[in-house]
Swiss-Prot record:
Domain CN hydrolase residues, every copy: 29-300
GO biological process: detoxification of nitrogen compound
Catalytic activity: a nitrile + 2 H2O = a carboxylate + NH4(+); 3-cyano-L-alanine + 2 H2O = L-aspartate + NH4(+)
Protein known as: Bifunctional nitrilase/nitrile hydratase NIT4B
Source species: Nicotiana tabacum
EC number: 3.5.5.1, 3.5.5.4
Transmembrane segments: none
Biological role: Highly specific for beta-cyano-L-alanine (Ala(CN)). Low activity with 3-phenylpropionitrile (PPN). Not associated with auxin production but may be involved in cyanide detoxification.
Inducing factors: Not induced by abscisic acid or by 1-aminocyclopropane-1-carboxylic acid (ACC).
Listed InterPro entries: C-N_Hydrolase, C-N_Hydrolase_sf, Nitrilase/CN_hydratase_CS, Nitrilases_CHs
SUPFAM superfamilies found in the cross-reference section: Carbon-nitrogen hydrolase (SSF56317)
Family under the similarity heading: Belongs to the carbon-nitrogen hydrolase superfamily. Nitrilase family.
Recorded GO MF terms: cyanoalanine nitrilase activity; nitrilase activity; nitrile hydratase activity
Signal peptide: none
């Protein structure tokens, strides 16, 4: 493994860890997970930062680049949005207004720019965003191909804890796995990865490169990522932000509840981004040192070698005993009868 120095970004150290594949008999894919902080409440500046990071990854030959959960729009760590049981504050509502303003429409101009970036640097891009759909927000992952096309999205189906007051719930219509020249790529966000039925649905779609954007920097997260790699016989790419208090607006504009003693340099999210092989081997990371590009060459032959032992939806399945139904249609709270239906019911 080599450490490749890169320019300083936002006064933080940044480097790439590269694990070079040694098996030339099967295809390899160079993948990079980005560990960096959002520029909070400044979506245009965050997009500029994303492009700098994407360009840097591409310069090292990355073919697939994965960004953290909520990189565009921001993960509002430490905020309560003024909520307690039976009460909401005016300050919290204003905080939500600002957060809503930082989110992006899908499709929309920011999506167009991300697509153009993917095409410019010839990479497949997996980007964590906060999606705005009217006045409901979703924690979403967007997928782009190396030709600059937007492929689609995954909406987080189960926000965690207080996330549920600011994010809506995705439905079964956005659990995609894309068949690409690099392999079959999909994503689950943060603690969705602890949902065994969601994972099983993705395994059934043949996922080979399993992307796990997250906001969880605890050591125990690594155990989950290793388990998924072994269970699914897939590569796991987990990208997390590395944030200090100074990466968020200063108080009183932004307050970390219960941690008012933080200094500007206090670490509030320590990263831990990692790349793991289908055999459970750590290929790169976890990194807890600062902003970084963490890369590895993925030997796609490892997938078949792992599946020889364990194929969770194939030869190791028992569908006559255990099975799963996935309701993968879009769900809307309001349905309107069509014009044709109205015409059929009209008097002649």
């Amino acid at each position: 493994m080599a450490l490749v120095p890169t320019p300083v970004v936002n006064e933080g150290p940044m480097f790439a860890e590269v694990d070079m594949g040694d098996n030339s008999s099967t295809p390899t894919v160079r993948a990079t997970v980005v560990q960096a902080s959002t520029i909070f409440y400044d979506t245009p500046a965050t997009l500029d930062k994303a492009e700098r990071l994407l360009a840097e990854a591409a310069s090292y030959g990355a073919q697939l680049v994965v960004f953290p959960e909520a990189f565009i729009g921001g993960y509002p760590r430490g905020s309560t949005f003024g909520v307690s049981i039976g009460n909401r504050t005016a300050k919290g509502k204003e905080e939500f207004r600002k957060y809503h303003a930082s989110a992006i429409d899908v499709p929309g101009p920011e999506v167009d720019r991300l697509a153009a970036m993917a095409g410019k640097y010839k990479v497949y891009l997996v980007m964590g965003v906060i999606e705005r759909d009217g006045y409901t927000l979703y924690c979403t992952v967007l997928f782009f191909d190396s030709q600059g096309h937007y492929l689609g999205k995954h909406r987080k189906i189960m926000p965690t804890a207080l996330e549920r007051i600011i994010w809506g719930f995705g439905d079964g219509s956005t659990i995609p796995v894309y068949d690409t020249p690099l392999g079959k790529i999909g994503a689950a966000i943060c603690w969705e990865n602890r949902m065994p039925l969601l994972r099983t649905a993705m395994y059934a779609k043949g996922i080979e490169i399993y992307c796990a954007p997250t906001a969880d920097s605890r050591d125990v997260w690594q155990a989950s990522m290793t388990h998924i790699a072994l269970e699914g016989g897939c590569f796991v790419l987990s990208a997390n932000q590395f944030c200090r208090r100074k990466d968020y607006p200063p108080p009183p504009e932004y307050v970390f509840s219960g941690t008012e003693d933080l200094t500007p340099d206090s670490i509030v999210c320590a990263g831990g981004s990692v790349i793991i092989s289908p055999s459970g081997a750590v290929l790169a990371g976890p990194n807890y040192e600062g902003e970084a590009l963490i890369s590895a060459d993925l030997d796609l032959g490892e997938i078949a070698r792992a599946k020889f032992d364990f194929d969770v939806v194939g030869h190791y399945a028992r569908p006559e005993v255990l099975s799963l139904i996935v309701r993968d249609h879009a769900v809307s709270p309001v349905s309107f009868t069509s014009t044709s239906s109205k015409a059929e019911s009209s008097p002649k």
